[in-house]
């Protein structure tokens, strides 16, 4: 019973051509698939492997926070690229370098490495001292982190580096200081990995831009916000200030959980600028607390050149103010805030009155921000303002739902004594803290929203898009939106949303392009009109780059030295003459070139020439003259030299060793080794002996004499198809002899033209055209009758080999072809076919028959033409 096919199966395009596994791009998602956190991806193409990011999940602990490293052999990774310093993108790097079999090279930007050093060091300390579990697994130590720092290599934006035939180019991503998008090129396939990126104009970062003049084949991009749209920047800044001032006006404290570096610096610029324009707020302090806050601010002051024009303008302005005041100790940098104070820890914090506190970490899992949350949450006058993205499973995400209580993880007594490990037992886990503070969310996360991300994807115009770094529902909404845009596109975009541990394989067949250099670059390339002209040279591959050059240029352009290997082979034949050898070689290779022989006169002439400018030396007469051996030399296919020594019947082959010449030499040796035993050679040898011995006039019987013209023609086609393929067809229309065409053009009777004019006008033809068509048909019919009387079934045969066409006229076996190589080859094959199959249409050699038996028949055709013209 027939089953109904799915519509997708009926509409799917069928591609029967198999795909080479090396032509497939493999994408493995070890983390960050359908989730935000522990970003880690693997791309493989043409035997090259690149790892993108190595982060940890902020909502998990121990090995569960790591990407799924066990699913992939990290020893095969060539390059590891870190997009930026955030923990969900870089904090697993010390584990990879110190605890796995990773052997590749690691790259990040200068600013990323500078901040990464302090950020990961602080993260290790906080994780080991403030944990929600008594049995926390230590993934790596501070020593592991510091010892692996020298393994990290730094690169600049907009610079291209080639590592193991992989080209990488970082571009500004606009997410945080040093954040980079990476363009990866492998064997001509361009892959753009955005990491976390932002296209929004802010106060200190350069927004991300599409790489100019580069065709992107695969785009790997974040999908953090899906298709959600953020309000304009000015509206969000106004809402932020309104929320903060509202909390302060009611006598409360403002807690802003942020990452120690990144958005915190942008928020500090906004607050410092607002406080400067509002004197009534200047009595309220702004605190920026964190173990690495002060040290990392030095990094921001160092890399002002990597920031946007706003920071550079502010830097020049404050430098001018400092010079004008004459006080060299005055603050002159854009990161020297007037109203922001840095705190190392809460030990020196006097928690009295209103304030604005920026504390890390941003997810409120542990650390200073969690301790302040537990301290301020019971007071309804206080407020929490969330400005970053909140990951699923974290306290920050739970707080957005405004729960009535929160679990106590960090706690301090009134005297400032710390109680550690509150969540270590079941009894301590029951301790809950009431939440009465307000919770506001105003997004300043430096991620593209739905509109910005979609516009960027459209501008890149990559045929393949892979979405990562996004919750499943956000990712699927963005995928649906992108697929809905395919209706107006000629080339449909493929969108992939792999989950963790998923593998995506995408076929890419890239054309191999070779760059012509050296002497060959000065030769004009062959045009379409050139008949089979080829450009030959040496193809050199360096990684995935191909260069075509002349052998003489190998040392200069490829750094290679060349060695020519001359091969020689000696074969001794018992009875074959050079005539038989040449006949056999021409039957296989077509026309061969004769280079001459070393006759004694030439040798004597060379020996009597003056030496070093001296006079000719007079030779003494010899007592006995030894006959000089004559050597005949021929060149086969322009590469194999054959020397035949007639006295010893030794054949010497010499050629320059390479793949092409070796094949030709093998074929020549195969012909020579069978020349004395093959049936065709025996027949030819008997014919040659018969011509030389005139005492025997007995003719050999023709085994094909009983064949008719049609059978003979079929045998001829069979032999031609064996040599040139099946694209052979008979020619139906004969050639009109040149003598008949001349008579038709020179003899023209005006009275006949006038008589025919009235008939041709009715038919819509001119008299000359009508008369010419009728006479041509009758002449062709007479020519066909003449050929059939000779036993020739068709005027000729047309042979097509690739784009070349050869025509063989069977009356005299004349070959017409624009390509000289094919013409000579067809001529030799026709002669061998005639001699092997039968005597064709008459007795004797084809050329002799054409000259002896054609003249009378042509005279009959000419007289027939004259008769037609007279009758007309």
From Swiss-Prot:
Record's compositionally biased regions (Basic residues): 686-695
Pfam family of the protein (one): Lactamase_B
InterPro entries named in the record: Beta_Casp (IPR022712), CPSF73-100_C (IPR021718), MBL (IPR050698), Metallo-B-lactamas (IPR001279), RibonucZ/Hydroxyglut_hydro (IPR036866), RMMBL (IPR011108)
GO cellular component: mRNA cleavage and polyadenylation specificity factor complex
Signal peptide as annotated in the record: none
Residues covered by region (Disordered): 682-706, 741-777, 844-872
Gene3D superfamilies reported in the protein's UniProt record: 3.40.50.10890, Ribonuclease Z/Hydroxyacylglutathione hydrolase-like (3.60.15.10)
Entries under PANTHER family matching the protein: CLEAVAGE AND POLYADENYLATION SPECIFICITY FACTOR FAMILY MEMBER (PTHR11203), CLEAVAGE AND POLYADENYLATION SPECIFICITY FACTOR SUBUNIT 3 (PTHR11203:SF11)
Function, as annotated: Component of the cleavage factor I (CF I) involved in pre-mRNA 3'-end processing.
Protein name (database record): Endoribonuclease ysh1
Species the sequence originates in: Aspergillus fumigatus (strain ATCC MYA-4609 / CBS 101355 / FGSC A1100 / Af293)
Name of the encoding gene: ysh1
